[in-house]
Amino acid sequence: MSEALLVKVGGSLRGAEALLEELAAYPGPLVLVHGGGPEIGEWLKRLGYESRFVGGLRVTPPEQLEVVEMALYLTGKRLAWGLSRRGRKALALSGRDALCLRGRALPELGRVGEVVGVEVGLLLDLLEKGYTPLLAPIALDEEGPLNVNADTAAGAVAGALGWPAVFLTDVEGVYRNPKDPKTRFPRLTPKEVEALKEEGVIQGGMIPKVEAALAALRAGAPWAAVAKGERGVLRRLLSGEGGTLFSPS
């Protein structure tokens, strides 16, 4: 059997046809965590709310949280439909379902939180029955739902499952020179990542992607990877032909 993978996908469905084909055809078990940034932003704007970010996290006042949940719900259902009609039965869930994700609030950001616990029982039950779980990054604390960064949620779920975490992005891994495909790093350790950050090789928008991969390792994932979300990505990644794989040592 092919390796079980936790895959974090973006929330945008624009241009996602090839990626959906790729995921639907993967022969091994998958758990997917999805974002929803574009859909959330569009709905907030439509309803007259302003989108604000602090440290890359969406500020989510209580009055906006229902909008965020609605947008994530719609995104998850569309992704699940896209996979199901390609032959991979997928079920869209929220992290609040069956207490999958337990969170701790970051009050300065409103109803935003970080994951402090993961219950994987429902995910494993669905996998055993032949379904692919598709999880929206909503956690629960004592006061209700929390908006959680999708990369953070994906790393936590991968760690709880003990599965590798694959973060699909718009770039093909880490490069010493982004303009030269021959300079891709096929594999990095946390120590090497810190050295590359000090050199300025890993900078800008790549930093949060790499940090998400390292967080997955700390949570218990055997390895993590950053790769471009396009047709053939999983085959290339698992064969060492694409992406950047992060291992504990």
Curated annotation (Swiss-Prot):
Reply yes or no: does the keyword ATP-binding apply: yes
UniProt EC number: 2.7.2.8
For the ligand (substrate), the binding residues are 36-37, 58, 147
Annotated SUPFAM superfamilies: Carbamate kinase-like
Where does it mainly reside?
cytoplasm
Localisation per UniProt entry:
Cytoplasm
Q: Name one GO cellular component term.
A: cytoplasm
User: From the Swiss-Prot or TrEMBL record, what is one GO molecular function term?
Assistant: acetylglutamate kinase activity
Query: Its pathway?
Result: Amino-acid biosynthesis; L-arginine biosynthesis; N(2)-acetyl-L-ornithine from L-glutamate: step 2/4
Domain of life, per lineage = Bacteria
Q: Where is this site: Transition state stabilizer?
A: 8, 209
Under catalytic activity, the entry for this protein gives: N-acetyl-L-glutamate + ATP = N-acetyl-L-glutamyl 5-phosphate + ADP
Which InterPro entries does this chain map to? Answer: AceGlu_kinase-like_sf (IPR036393), AcgluKinase_fam (IPR004662), ArgB (IPR037528), Asp/Glu/Uridylate_kinase (IPR001048)
Which Gene Ontology BP terms does the record give? arginine biosynthetic process via ornithine; L-arginine biosynthetic process
Describe the family membership recorded for this protein in Swiss-Prot or TrEMBL: Belongs to the acetylglutamate kinase family. ArgB subfamily.
| Function as written in the Swiss-Prot or TrEMBL entry | Catalyzes the ATP-dependent phosphorylation of N-acetyl-L-glutamate.
Protein name in the entry: Acetylglutamate kinase
Q: Which organism is it from?
A: Thermus thermophilus (strain ATCC 27634 / DSM 579 / HB8)
Taxonomy of origin reads:
Bacteria, Thermotogati, Deinococcota, Deinococci, Thermales
